[in-house]
Swiss-Prot record:
Disruption phenotype: Deletion mutant is unable to transport succinate, and does not grow on D-malate, L-malate, succinate or fumarate as the sole carbon source under aerobic conditions in the dark. This is C4-dicarboxylate-binding periplasmic protein DctP. GO terms for cellular component: outer membrane-bounded periplasmic space. Part of the tripartite ATP-independent periplasmic (TRAP) transport system DctPQM involved in C4-dicarboxylates uptake. Binds C4-dicarboxylates such as fumarate, succinate, L-malate and D-malate. Keywords: Periplasm, Signal, Sugar transport, Transport. One of its GO terms (biological process) is transmembrane transport. The keyword Transport applies. Residues 1-26 form the signal peptide.
Length: 333
């Protein structure tokens, strides 16, 4: 059922469509770029950079309006809004495409599938990444780029050193069957919850812990309500920058070319700062002193991997064995 907000936004989208069909109008083409995180995260800064460059490279023909912190839609609502044309651009986390029916993207959620950023970028910046983005076309979505956030850490109010430490803990996750399997493998109880609701849920004890890259944990002040965190780097959180396909295909060719250039440069910028931003956030949380951080030893990491890597085979039928194989082959190149 359509929400009132989406229906209201559709009125504006219809007006935009009419404006595009009348070349004589000098009004700029408006691109509403919605996302759910803070402006000072890697994604938030990437969106701001795209806003700047898009207007520059289209000579003012495009006006990008960035809406951070779920100002327009929560993360569960965003994709529907995009498909209906209520917003034109999003950068949802890659876990969001599984529930949409493009389960290949859940390969990014598999624990310990990427050793480091170098291995990751062989996928997101290579042929495997292009193949994955192309699968969105059938859903009325055009994929433009992959943006990094970073590798995730685990947090809770009790130490998380070994897999047994998760037994019975209620852990917040995004809506993802892979992340459910990950938490189940650890003996935790996965709790699907919108990102905007996590701080309060941690504060009130609705959930015991969660997983996030440091930048997300820090900018949402989750370290204020989590006593312990483990730098596990067990999983990756990234985004796909996407647009409504009908909107994109209807843009004048020169405008689309300018936007593609802006996106390419914004992607280099966003990915270039992601690792640095996470390192800064981690250090800032350590300095704040409200959370005790633990670095896994080699022995502890091996124990985590032993418990979590069987999730790869468990999810092969859902994600696609060929997709998993293609990603692993790309990382090994």
């Amino acid at each position: 059922m359509l929400t009132r907000r989406i229906l209201g936004a559709l009125v504006g989208a219809t007006a935009l469509s009419l404006a595009l069909s009348v070349p004589a109008l000098a009004e700029p083409i408006v691109i509403k770029f919605s996302h759910v995180v803070a402006p000072d995260t890697p994604k938030g800064k990437g969106a701001a950079k795209f806003e700047e460059l898009a207007e520059k490279y289209t000579n003012g023909a495009v006006d990008v309006e960035v809406y951070p912190n779920s100002q327009l839609y929560k993360d569960k609502e965003e994709l529907e809004a995009l498909q209906l044309g209520a917003v034109q651009m999003l950068a949802p986390s890659l876990a969001k495409f599984g529930p949409l029916g493009v389960q290949d993207f859940e390969v990014f959620d598999l624990p310990y599938i990427f050793k480091d950023y170098e291995a990751l970028h062989k996928v997101t910046q290579g042929e495997a990444g292009k193949m994955l983005l192309s699968k969105l076309e059938a859903k009325g979505i055009t994929g433009l780029a992959f943006w990094d956030n970073g590798f995730k850490i685990m947090s809770a109010n009790t130490p998380l050193t070994m897999p047994d430490d998760f037994l019975g803990l209620k852990m917040r996750i995004q809506s993802s069957k892979v992340l459910e399997a990950e938490m189940n493998a650890l003996g935790a109880v996965p709790q699907v919850m919108a990102f905007s609701e996590v701080y309060q849920a941690l504060q009130t004890g609705v959930v015991d812990g969660t997983e996030n890259p440091p930048s997300n944990m820090f900018t949402q002040k989750m370290n204020e309500v989590q006593k312990h965190a483990t730098v596990s780097n067990h999983g990756y959180l990234g985004y796909a920058v996407i647009v409504n396909k009908q909107f994109w295909d209807g843009l004048p060719a020169d405008v689309r070319t300018g936007l593609e250039k802006a996106m390419a440069e914004s992607t280099d910028y966003a990915n270039g700062i992601a690792k640095e931003e996470n390192e800064k956030a981690l250090q800032a949380m350590k300095d704040a002193g409200t959370t005790e951080f633990h670095e896994l030893t080699a022995e502890e990491r091996a124990a985590w991997e032993e418990v979590l890597t069987p999730v790869h085979d468990e999810m092969a039928e859902r994600i696609g064995a060929e997709t998993i194989a293609a990603v692993k082959a790309a990382t090994a190149e």
